[in-house]
Curated annotation (Swiss-Prot):
Its main location: Golgi. The lineage of its organism: Eukaryota, Amoebozoa, Evosea, Eumycetozoa, Dictyostelia. GO terms for cellular component: Golgi membrane; Golgi transport complex. PANTHER family: COMPONENT OF OLIGOMERIC GOLGI COMPLEX 6 (PTHR21506), CONSERVED OLIGOMERIC GOLGI COMPLEX SUBUNIT 6 (PTHR21506:SF0). This is Conserved oligomeric Golgi complex subunit 6. Required for normal Golgi function. Component of the conserved oligomeric Golgi complex which is composed of eight different subunits and is required for normal Golgi morphology and localization. Keywords: Golgi apparatus, Membrane, Protein transport, Transport.
């Protein structure tokens, strides 16, 4: 095979059909090789070379144009280079000329920075130590609102800061100047606030009826007044920093409320309520208890309303006042704030209580005068004590209203009047019992019960203790309150009982029965109140036991005399035990036998139940049974002692067993039965 052909064939076979170059070549060929004719195939090579030549010519044309552009760019670059050289030369020249200017600019820049720092410092200083125009305006504008109090607080902050600076830096002169300006602002502001507060107190607190509801509901009447009411506690709170002005405001409140309370009390006494409802209190002047109760009830209601009213007004006040020295107010506040150990020796009082105490001082005189008039009408002991109980009740209620905030003046007034009533009460008791003792009534020998005077005194005691028991006195204080009032009264009744008994000239046994009946009546009254009458019950029990011993001894002696062995027992009791009883006069065997027979007959006739007329007169059934039993026991013991003496061989009685019909145990059984 022809080698040329072989190379061509081999070349064709070596062609990679998936070659990207082959694909691109064929794709380009399809753009101009549209007809597959013989002529086209023959001219294909020429056509391709022609196209290749055209492409090179186009490339050459483009390259010529690019070359021209590059040459132009080179020329432009040369121009720019020359311009830059000129600029650099100019800049170097300018730099040499303006170096001094730059130096000055740098110095000015540093100076500007320092000025800005000083400006910031001054702004901070003014912000810290100087009021803004708005704040200064809030201190002088007509209406006092929240901005006024904010400025006051700001003044206090500046003042405190100045005081700190006086201790911590060397700029004392400007600090003093600022402090002087701030103090002047403060003084003017507080004086203005004081005047405003004083006027508001006069306008808002002069109301006819001191009821807090009307005070709180002022917004229904007028919106402006509501705002003033809301600002009043804030104003008083701010004035705490000026103790003297604050005290004057408290005095102003007290004065306004004093007028209102005084007028209200006199109106309630003389005219009553609107349209006569409720009726005037003095319409019940004929009934001391009702009269006093109505007056105290009005004061109590008024105190409750006033306490709520003043508590609202002073709700933001936190300081306390020294009650012992009201003049030195600054010292009071300073001591209170320091809260040092010396404060334990001072008597501090809440401002609320101070205002209430001053306000209610006006009721002291009219109330005292009317109670003195009641006492001058000489009411009974019961009425007087009920008045005392009413005063004690409302005194304790007054202390409950003030919640232990301090000494309530109303309670003190009631306590003082109560002391006067107690003096009258004790005088009445003394006069009453002195009158009874001057002409004592003697007991009836038939029943030996308490006389009418003693019964009346015991009934009074019962009513008095019942009144005392219904009081508000705490259980742990009742005995302490009871003793000084009632112990003397009970002792007076006992003394009257003793005086009546001794004046009656009754036998000792009858006097003992009478005393027991009287004392047991008193004891029966006290036994209902054992929680606080224990001391008196113990005293009465001891006295009753003493009189019971007398009664039992006398009744036993009387019965033994009636039964015939009384004389024998007397001889037996006083014998000297040196000689036999049988040799003593009236103690021979025959006399003993006769006495024993008489004793047995009396006992047999009464069937063991002896008549004890004096014991029967005891009104208390328990004491009556106890006395009878005691008498029977003594009789049994007496019989036993006589029986033992007769059977004693030393006494030389013949056949002692034949003398006695009954043994002691039998006698005891008969008496017990």
């Amino acid at each position: 095979m022809n080698s040329t052909l072989s190379r061509k064939i081999q070349k064709v076979l070596d062609i990679k059909l998936d070659s990207e170059d082959l694909s691109n070549a064929l794709e380009e060929l399809s753009t101009f090789y549209t007809s597959n004719s013989i002529g086209a195939r023959r001219n294909l090579r020429n056509e391709i070379e022609k196209r290749y030549l055209d492409i090179n010519i186009q490339f050459l044309d483009q390259f010529d144009q690019l070359n021209k552009n590059i040459n132009e760019l080179v020329l432009d670059f040369e121009g720019i280079k020359n311009s830059c050289v000129d600029i650099c030369d100019h800049l170097n020249s300018t730099n040499r000329v303006s170096s001094e200017l730059l130096k000055n600019a740098h110095e000015l820049s540093c100076g500007l920075k320092e000025i800005k720092e000083k400006e910031n410092t001054l702004q901070q200083f003014f912000k810290k130590f100087k009021l803004t125009p708005q704040e200064e305006q809030s201190l002088v504008k007509k209406e006092i609102d929240s901005s006024f109090y904010q400025t006051l607080d700001r003044l206090s902050e500046i003042q405190n800061e100045c005081k700190k600076n006086l201790l911590s830096n060397q700029y004392q002169k400007p600090t003093y100047e600022i402090l002087e300006i701030i103090t002047k602002h403060q003084d003017n502001a507080y004086r203005r606030l004081y005047q405003w507060t004083k006027e508001e107190i006069k306008q808002l607190l002069i109301i006819e009826i001191p009821i807090l509801d009307s005070f709180n509901n002022i917004d229904q009447q007028q919106q402006q007044q509501q705002q003033k009411v809301m600002m009043l506690p804030i104003a008083l709170s701010a004035l705490q920093n000026k103790p003297l002005l604050f005290k004057h405001c408290l005095d102003e409140i007290s004065e306004c409320r004093t007028k209102t309370i005084s007028n209200g009390f006199i109106t309630a006494l003389s005219f009553g309520g609107p349209n006569g409802i409720p009726r005037p209190i003095e319409i019940n002047a004929h009934d001391p208890q009702r009269y006093l109760g109505d007056m105290l009830a009005w004061i109590h209601q008024c105190l409750a309303s006033e306490f709520e009213l003043i508590s609202t007004i002073l709700s933001k006040v936190t300081i306390k006042l020294n009650e012992n020295n009201n003049n030195n107010v600054d010292d009071n506040i300073e001591n209170n704030n320091n809260n040092n150990n010396n404060n334990e020796e001072l008597n501090f009082i809440e401002p609320i209580i101070k205002v209430l105490n001053n306000s209610f001082e006006c009721i002291n005189r009219p109330l005292s005068i009317r109670i003195d008039q009641i006492l001058q009408s000489k009411p009974g002991v019961i009425i007087t004590y009920k008045m005392i109980s009413l005063l004690d009740f409302y005194s304790r209620m007054a202390n409950l209203i003030t919640k232990g905030s301090g000494v309530c003046r109303v309670s003190t007034i009631f306590g003082s009047i109560k002391s006067n009533c107690l003096s009258v009460f004790f005088t009445q008791i003394k006069d009453n019992f002195d009158r009874l003792e001057r002409s004592p009534t003697v007991p009836s020998p038939q029943d030996l019960l308490p006389t009418n005077d003693i019964k009346d005194s015991i009934n009074k005691l019962s009513e008095l203790i019942s009144t005392f028991n219904s009081s508000l006195i705490p259980l742990d204080e009742r005995e302490k309150e009871y003793t000084p009032v009632f112990s003397s009264f009970i002792q007076k009744i006992i003394n009257l009982t003793t005086f009546s008994a001794t004046s009656s000239k009754l036998p000792l046994i009858s006097m003992a029965v009478f005393m027991i009946n009287c004392l047991s009546s008193i004891k029966s009254v006290l036994e209902n109140y054992t929680s606080f009458t224990a001391s008196n019950l113990e005293l009465l029990t001891c006295q009753i036991e003493a009189h019971m011993d007398t009664l039992v001894e006398e009744q036993t002696s009387e019965l033994l005399q009636q039964m015939g062995i009384g004389p024998k027992l007397s001889i037996l009791q006083y014998s000297d035990n040196k000689s036999p009883l049988s040799q003593i006069i009236a103690m021979d065997r025959l006399s003993i036998v006769q006495s024993i027979r008489q004793f047995d007959n009396c006992l047999e006739q009464s069937f063991g139940t002896l008549l004890m007329p004096n014991c029967e007169k005891l009104s208390d059934t328990t004491l009556r049974s106890l006395s009878k039993k005691s008498v029977s026991n003594l009789i049994s013991v007496a019989y036993s002692s006589l029986y033992s003496a007769i059977h004693d061989p030393f006494n030389q009685y013949d056949e002692p067993n034949s003398i006695f019909q009954y043994k002691p145990d039998q006698i005891k059984t008969m008496l017990d039965f």
